[in-house]
Structures are given as C-alpha cells and as structure tokens.
Amino acid sequence: MARFPEAEARIFRKLICMRCGATNPWGAKKCRKCGYKGLRPKAREPRGGGR
C-alpha cells in the first residue's frame, strides 16, 4: 500500500469501532464516542470491489 513504513504506520495504526465506526488510537480499550469495547484494526486491504 504505502511506499514506506512510517507512512503505513501513520495510516493503519488505528482502531475502528465496530458499533459506530469512529477512529480510535492504537492503544484504546474502548471507543471514545460510544464506549463500546469491540474495536478492530483498520483494514489494510480494501473490501468489496465497487460492484
């Protein structure tokens, strides 16, 4: 994806809330907006395909 590791770390070292979709910092235990504990890492590969 990114051309160098620093950029990749800046883009992908984030957690996404599975309830509200908010972006959270990497070390978070719960969502900053809704308090939900179900966080996933940001996807490195696109899903779907646009069709």
From Swiss-Prot:
The UniProt entry's GO CC annotations, sorted and at most eight, read: ribonucleoprotein complex; ribosome
Q: Write down the PANTHER family for this protein, in alphabetical order.
A: 50S RIBOSOMAL PROTEIN L40E, LARGE RIBOSOMAL SUBUNIT PROTEIN EL40
Protein family (similarity comment): Belongs to the eukaryotic ribosomal protein eL40 family.
Alphabetized GO MF terms: structural constituent of ribosome
Q: What is this protein called?
A: Large ribosomal subunit protein eL40
Annotated keywords: Ribonucleoprotein, Ribosomal protein
UniProt cross-references to SMART domains, sorted A to Z: Ribosomal_L40e (SM01377)
GO BP terms in the entry: translation
**Record's keyword annotation contains Acetylation:** no
Report whether Ribosomal protein shows up as a keyword of the record: yes
Q: Which gene encodes it?
A: rpl40e
